[in-house]
């Protein structure tokens, strides 16, 4: 986790379903023991450490379920990623450090590629984009919103530079 990066902190606080492979003292409610085979949801930052040390096995969290994957495969531009999780790409990156899943890699890359075209279009004409694609813009996750802002600011800077050199 990047100590000062709020997006990293928020993405690592996403809950991840796990199954304990050993009894873990002090991890349960009010410091109780979690018995072997218990299903628990832990924040990613804790699940990662426990999984690396073989105390838990991690299962795929809801933002990467087969339902979400199928929706993203069918038409990534129609999915409101923000409703799934506000830090989809950061969370996917973190999960892929633990779980090898080529399908998730391809779906995430294809989703970003497809949505990047609409994001770029919206950054060039923000008023028109808000009128035509308000639902799409509202469904952007935080990384996509960052791309939208950076692209819009770069376009504005280019126009200002062109006007100043004329």
Swiss-Prot record:
Which GO cellular component terms, listed alphabetically, does the Swiss-Prot or TrEMBL entry include? Answer: chromatin; cytoplasm; GINS complex; nuclear replication fork; nucleus
A Pfam match is Sld5
Please list every transmembrane segment annotated in the UniProt record, as residue ranges.
none
Q: What is its main location?
A: cytoplasm
Q: Where in the cell does this protein reside?
A: Cytoplasm; Nucleus
Q: Which domain of life is it from?
A: Eukaryota
Name the UniProt key words of this record, in alphabetical order.
Answer: Cytoplasm, DNA replication, Nucleus
Write the signal peptide boundaries: none
Could you tell me which InterPro entries the record lists for this protein?
A: GINS_A, GINS_bundle-like_dom_sf, GINS_Psf3, GINS_Psf3_sf, PSF3_N
Q: Which GO terms describe its biological process?
A: DNA replication initiation; mitotic DNA replication initiation
Describe its assembly.
Component of the GINS complex which is a heterotetramer of sld5, psf1, psf2 and psf3.
Per the record, the similarity remark reads: Belongs to the GINS3/PSF3 family.
Q: What does this protein do?
A: The GINS complex plays an essential role in the initiation of DNA replication.
* UniProt name for this protein: DNA replication complex GINS protein psf3
Which organism's genome codes for this protein?
Schizosaccharomyces pombe (strain 972 / ATCC 24843) (Fission yeast)
């Amino acid at each position: 986790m990047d100590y000062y990066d709020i997006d990293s902190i928020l993405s690592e606080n996403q809950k991840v379903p796990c199954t304990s492979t050993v009894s873990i003292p002090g991890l349960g409610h009010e410091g109780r023991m979690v018995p072997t085979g218990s299903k628990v949801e832990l924040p990613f930052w804790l699940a990662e450490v426990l999984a690396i040390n073989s105390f838990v096995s991690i299962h795929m969290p809801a933002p990467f379920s087969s339902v979400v994957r199928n929706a993203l495969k069918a038409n990534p531009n129609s999915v409101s990623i923000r409703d799934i999780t506000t830090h989809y790409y950061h969370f996917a990156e973190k999960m892929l450090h633990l779980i090898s899943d080529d399908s998730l890699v391809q779906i995430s890359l294809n989703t970003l590629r497809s949505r990047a075209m609409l994001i770029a279009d919206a950054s060039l004409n923000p008023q028109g984009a808000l009128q035509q694609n308000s639902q799409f813009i509202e469904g952007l996750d935080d990384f996509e919103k960052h791309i939208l802002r950076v692209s819009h600011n770069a376009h504005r800077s280019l126009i200002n530079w062109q006007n100043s050199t004329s």
